[in-house]
UniProtKB/Swiss-Prot annotation:
GO molecular function (one): NAD+ binding
InterPro entries hit by this protein: 3-OHacyl-CoA_DH_NAD-bd, 3HC_DH_C, 6-PGluconate_DH-like_C_sf, ClpP/crotonase-like_dom_sf, Enoyl-CoA_hydra/iso, NAD(P)-bd_dom_sf
EC number from the UniProt entry: 1.1.1.35
Catalyzed reactions per annotation: a (3S)-3-hydroxyacyl-CoA + NAD(+) = a 3-oxoacyl-CoA + NADH + H(+)
Alphabetized UniProt keyword annotations: Fatty acid metabolism, Lipid degradation, Lipid metabolism, NAD, Oxidoreductase
Similarity-based family: Belongs to the 3-hydroxyacyl-CoA dehydrogenase family.
Gene: fadN
Lineage, broadest ranks: Bacteria, Bacillati, Bacillota, Bacilli, Bacillales
GO BP term, pick one: fatty acid beta-oxidation
Pathway named in the protein's UniProt entry: Lipid metabolism; fatty acid beta-oxidation
Annotated protein name in UniProt: Probable 3-hydroxyacyl-CoA dehydrogenase
Induction: Repressed by FadR in the absence of LCFAs (fatty acids of 14-20 carbon atoms). When LCFAs are present in the medium, they are converted to long-chain acyl-CoAs, which antagonize FadR as to its binding to fadR boxes on target DNA and thus derepress transcription.
Function in brief: Involved in the degradation of long-chain fatty acids.
Length: 789
């Protein structure tokens, strides 16, 4: 099937609809955003002399939604410029335009009859073969298609995005009986490769997979809290990062989602369930009281938590009053925290017989049993359920992975002792001697499915570094980095220091990696699969050395860092950097000299050293300045833009924004699906080699010199006089201005790169000896945020 989605239409411009439209715009798909025609004029429209027939009025809702996209946090758009891909309109005047769309997505109110009316309109105006989908979070997709044409049904399915659409990975696809299998296959591939999502196929049941299990787990947690007399803060102490869940844990998650939204999702199942399941999905009375009071969470200013000034209070579910935050106090909990890794932490706590252990057991065991009971009803296999929970709710471990972590056999024995009913398929599994849901052989992961283990089907674009290292081994390794054979004659330099911070160990491994690549490989990728690409240089090491007055050691490290970055730039084989997540300071400097950057769409890049009292010390000043020159800026303008970006420690909110900041060059590329990042980078490195890559020829750099230095200082002085920056900020700015301007040389002087690196290194060393800079470094290491002194 050679289908293409060149244009889309989103019907419904609320938070979810506009968010989906924004995500499509982010990847360059033109989208028509339609909503209903308002009944009345606003006062502002009346003042303008508009009438109900004015197009501005008739398309008001979608126009307003577009304006809100520019103000929302977190930002739905990867760049404000992407609004140019969105065309606002309304469902009456612009219905004819639906025939232009290859994909039409309904995102209106969760009401079956309203949705059916919308789809009748769509069926009338769509072109034959266009894909139509609903973003419903739990209404029957099959029922929505009743009465529609055969071609409509063949091209219809559910596409449930999680909010916010840009950031949350999960896309549940729900086919109906009549959905063409080729359409399901196409949308699955499109969802992963183009939209960048983690796609699972779900059954057409209430709340599908993630919301069904997630809502159950949250309600079970609330019920166990009430039964055991626990406090909100105590519960959140153990249901967050300790067990591989987001920091928001249980009740902060409910505040963010909104209790009103959560209650609606719970009622989807409650209305269709019976027996014990129905009772679990009944909203507890105290939560109904909260709904009546409007205490629905963050958007109302209070929910399970309330912030007054800088103090956060938590709700007592019994008295409905707010008090000081609580934390679980438990010897078993403290012992579990010392265990290494989420799996070990869970196992250490869940079998302990104290308040923390009992709570975790009661919550987890019920959720695991429920997940097992739903197999076949909500999804065909355990892997789909696990992936849905990880991608949709941010769990580190899916239910069946969690079960493996705590020990299936041990937990089953305890459940039987407590009189719980084990699902028949699990009893059968254990009787056959199979004690884990997942096994790994020769780097391939298998999952248990109907009496046998089946290999997890992987997109070839997903590279799992751990599995790769287990099968291919490691070429070289030290404490900070490893050199790995990535396949297809491309090597990978992986950072694995704490926070992937760059120290001498990583610098040495980059040297070794470049030498090995020049001998035996087509190219080198610099990348990893940590939480973030790199948060910067090893600040603790720098601070320790300067506090010991060991400036020679710091000079040596910075010199080696600069030399290594130059070696990357002029490598005989192409080097591709693959940044993602936080890519700050030295992390950005490690990318700038690469032949190409293959960035994840969610790459947050910037030279932020001023926040710790320093300036970039690995050639970042020079490379960013050169990038501006290459975009056609004259030396003065290029210096101004470089200075502003570094002095203000600007960080891009996306890879697209990094390109607009000239951190990425026009030739650099972006991967929407971060799971494909290393594959894309590998392909790019091999392609550069195969098409005759040659390293750049060294050229001199034209600088603005003394004239530029004076202009940069003038701006900094004005900021100081206006109270925007401190005296120490100004001192940093002076050093930075000197480096970017190229020192005290005439305007337009052409200097070599080594000279610029020398004055950069001198400025870095000078600032590192300043007491206030050291205070900033110390503050960042201890508090994790910048000190303005």
């Amino acid at each position: 099937m050679h289908k293409h989605i060149r244009k889309a239409a989103v019907l419904g411009s609320g938070v979810m609809g506009s968010g989906i439209a924004a995500h499509l715009a982010n990847i360059g798909i033109p989208v028509l955003l339609l909503d209903i025609v308002p009944n009345d004029l606003t006062k502002e429209e009346e003042k303008k002399g508009l009438t109900k027939d004015s197009s501005e009025v008739r398309s008001r809702l979608s126009r307003q939604a577009m304006k809100k996209l520019l103000k929302q946090k977190p930002a739905p758009l990867t760049s404000a410029k992407n609004t140019s891909y969105i065309t606002p309109g309304n469902l009456e005047d612009d219905a004819e335009k639906l025939k232009e769309a290859d994909w039409i997505i309904e995102v209106v109110v969760e009401n079956l009859e309203v949705k059916k009316k919308i789809f009748a309109l769509v069926d009338e105006h769509r072109k034959t073969g266009s894909i139509v989908s609903s973003n419903t979070s739990g209404i029957s997709v099959q029922e929505m298609a009743e009465g529609r044409s055969d071609d409509f049904k063949a091209h219809f399915l559910g596409t449930h995005f999680f909010n916010p659409a840009r950031y949350l990975k999960l896309l549940e696809i729900i086919p109906i009986k009549e959905t063409d299998p080729d359409i399901l296959k196409f949308m699955t591939a499109f969802g992963e490769n183009v939209l960048g999502k983690g796609v699972v196929t779900a059954k057409d049941t209430p709340n599908f997979i993630a919301n069904r299990i997630g809502t159950y787990g949250l309600l079970v947690t609330v019920q166990e809290m009430l039964k055991g007399g626990y406090q909100v803060g105590e519960v959140d102490s153990i249901t967050g990062p300790l067990i591989g869940r987001p920091k928001s844990a249980t009740f902060r998650t409910l505040d963010v989602v909104g209790l009103d939204t959560f209650a609606h999702v719970a009622r989807n199942v409650y209305d269709k369930a019976d027996g014990d399941e129905k009772e679990v999905f009944r909203i507890p009375s105290f939560m109904n009281d909260m709904l009546e009071k409007g205490w629905i969470g963050s958007k109302a200013g209070q929910g399970f938590y309330k912030k007054e000034g800088k103090t956060i209070y938590e709700l007592d579910p019994v008295t409905l009053t707010y008090g000081e935050r609580t934390k679980m106090k438990s010897p078993a909990l403290e012992a579990a925290k010392q265990a290494k890794g989420t799996k070990a932490k869970m196992k250490a706590l869940i079998y302990s017989d104290d308040r923390a252990g009992r709570l975790l057991w009661n919550i987890t065991s019920q959720t695991l049993l429920y997940s097992a009971e739903l197999l076949g009803e909500i999804a065909d296999d355990i892997h789909a359920i696990d992936q849905a929970m990880k991608w949709g709710f941010g769990w580190e471990l899916g239910p069946f992975e969690m079960w493996d972590a705590i020990g299936l056999k041990q937990s089953a024995e305890k459940l039987e002792q407590l009189g719980a009913d084990m699902p028949g398929w699990i009893k059968e599994m254990l009787d056959k001697g199979n004690e884990t849901f997942y096994i790994k052989e020769n780097g391939t992961v298998f999952y248990y499915d109907r009496g046998e283990y089946r290999a997890v089907k992987e997109n070839k674009k997903r590279i799992h570094l751990q599995a790769l290292k287990e099968t291919k081994g490691v070429i070289a390794k030290n404490s900070g980095a490893s050199l790995i054979d990535l396949g297809d004659d491309v090597a990978l330099l992986e950072f694995h220091s704490k926070s992937n911070a760059i120290g001498l160990d990583i610098i040495q491994m980059i040297h070794k990696g470049l030498e090995e690549t020049e001998r035996n490989y087509k190219g080198l990728v610099i990348g990893n699969q940590g939480k973030n690409f790199c948060v910067g240089a090893n600040l603790a090491m720098i601070l320790m050395e300067v506090q010991d007055d060991n400036f020679l050691e710091v000079d040596f490290v910075i010199r080696r860092f600069q030399e290594t970055m130059m070696k990357i730039k002029y490598s005989a084989k192409p080097v591709v950097a693959a940044p993602f997540g936080m890519t700050l300071g030295g992390g950005t400097e490690a990318c700038l000299p690469a032949a190409r950057i293959q960035a994840a769409s969610e790459a947050y890049m910037g030279l932020v050293e001023s926040g710790v009292g320093l300036i970039p010390g690995g050639g970042g000043n020079k490379e960013l300045y050169i990038n501006h020159l290459r975009r056609g800026h004259d030396p003065m303008n290029a210096a101004m833009k470089t200075f502003e970006t570094i002095a203000m420690a600007k960080v891009s909110a996306s890879a697209q924004e990094a390109r607009e900041m000239n951190i990425l060059k026009e030739t650099d590329q972006i991967s929407v699906n971060q799971d494909h990042l290393l594959y894309d980078a590998k392909q790019l490195a091999a392609s550069l080699y195969d098409t005759g890559w040659r390293p750049p020829v060294k050229e001199k750099v034209k600088v603005p010199g003394e004239t530029g230095y004076a202009a940069l200082l003038l701006g900094a002085e004005q900021m100081k006089l206006s109270g925007y920056i401190s005296e120490h900020d100004f001192k940093i700015a002076k050093k930075l201005a000197y480096v970017i301007a190229g020192g005290k040389v005439p305007f337009g002087t052409e200097v070599d790169e080594e000279y610029l690196l020398e004055i950069e290194r001198e400025a870095f060393l000078s600032l590192s000896g300043e007491a206030k800079s050291q205070a900033r470094m110390q503050h960042m290491l201890v508090k994790g945020k910048p000190l303005r002194n």
